[in-house]
């Protein structure tokens, strides 16, 4: 982006979150990319940042006026950091790494004009937006991905999960065995409605499992596409439903599991820590998900609210969940 005072900045979008950052002078001593780990803390520009995402990314295309040459095959290893309302990225595509600092922003606050038109509700791109239509490489069933935001698609017919960021459509996980339990969504993929007064569409369905003392507890998660590229979640366990939103501002940056802490004027107390494993994937998702993916989850409660931290080898995310009547 170029501003009226000729400053330039970068607006990024991932999973419905928009972040505006500006290039800053980086300290001379920065860790190497392969020495950085999710969850650790780094002190930069007087702030104690937490590493929340690590991606060994690759640029696949570029358009418009850019300060450097881009194109397919351009390697861009990046590390994302958060501290309260602040956001930073270390870009290891150059040596020394580039440092970009800024904050998440609401899309409407950008007051953008001349944007691509969306259909009513904003959940589905119009006919001018290129959609991918292909066949499941496992069973041959027809599949589709509505936009470039979609990184993986789960086949409802056989249970395989396909990488849609690769036009070769490689499998992220194979088809489920016939004897494996399959869940039917309570809310069908493609269902449309209003959630808290805003239009949404169900585009993805996922089943996860926790094992506790040898007993399996399965829960279901529905990915909802909303207006202007936003996403929300509905989760269900044993008939109990929650609306969940991924947070831009993380409640705390501690690697430890706290007994309690304050967030949004509420005191949240530790409820449980467990491993969640993906059992089933159906529909479209904005990241590469696969069956048998495992994450550590830590839940804190202040009924009817719950804060949930999910941690994998490459990412930490927080979600605020609110109990709703079925």
Model-derived features: positions:
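A composition-biased, non-transmembrane "mature-region" signal
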Residues: 1-326
């Amino acid at each position: 982006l170029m501003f009226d005072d000729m400053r330039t900045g970068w607006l990024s979008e991932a999973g419905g979150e928009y972040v505006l950052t500006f290039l800053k002078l980086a300290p001379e001593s920065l860790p190497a990319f392969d020495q950085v780990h999710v969850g650790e803390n780094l002190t930069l520009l007087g702030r104690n940042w937490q590493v929340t995402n690590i991606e060994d990314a690759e640029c696949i295309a570029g358009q418009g006026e850019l300060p450097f040459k881009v194109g397919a095959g351009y390697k861009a290893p990046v590390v994302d950091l958060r501290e309260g309302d602040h956001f930073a990225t270390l870009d290891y595509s150059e040596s020394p790494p580039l440092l970009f600092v800024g904050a998440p922003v609401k899309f409407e606050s950008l007051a953008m004009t001349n944007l691509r038109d969306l259909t009513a509700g904003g959940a589905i791109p119009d006919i001018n937006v290129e959609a991918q239509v292909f066949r499941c490489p496992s069973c041959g069933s027809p599949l589709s991905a509505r936009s470039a935001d979609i990184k993986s698609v789960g086949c409802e017919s056989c249970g395989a999960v396909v990488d849609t960021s690769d036009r070769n459509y490689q499998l992220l996980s194979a088809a489920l065995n016939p004897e494996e339990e399959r869940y039917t969504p309570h809310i069908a993929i493609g269902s449309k409605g209003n959630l808290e007064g805003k239009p949404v569409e169900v585009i993805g369905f996922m089943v996860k499992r926790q094992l506790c003392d040898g007993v399996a507890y399965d829960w279901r998660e529905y990915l909802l596409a909303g207006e202007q590229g936003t996403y929300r979640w509905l989760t269900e366990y044993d008939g109990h439903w929650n609306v969940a939103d991924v947070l831009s501002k993380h409640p705390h940056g501690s690697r430890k599991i706290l007994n309690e802490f304050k967030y949004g004027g509420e005191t949240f107390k530790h409820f449980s820590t467990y491993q969640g494993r993906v059992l089933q994937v159906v529909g479209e998702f904005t990241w590469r998900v696969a069956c048998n993916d495992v994450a550590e989850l830590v839940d804190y409660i202040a009924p009817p609210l719950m804060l949930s931290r999910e941690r994998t080898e490459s990412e930490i995310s927080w979600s605020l969940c609110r109990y709703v009547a079925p």
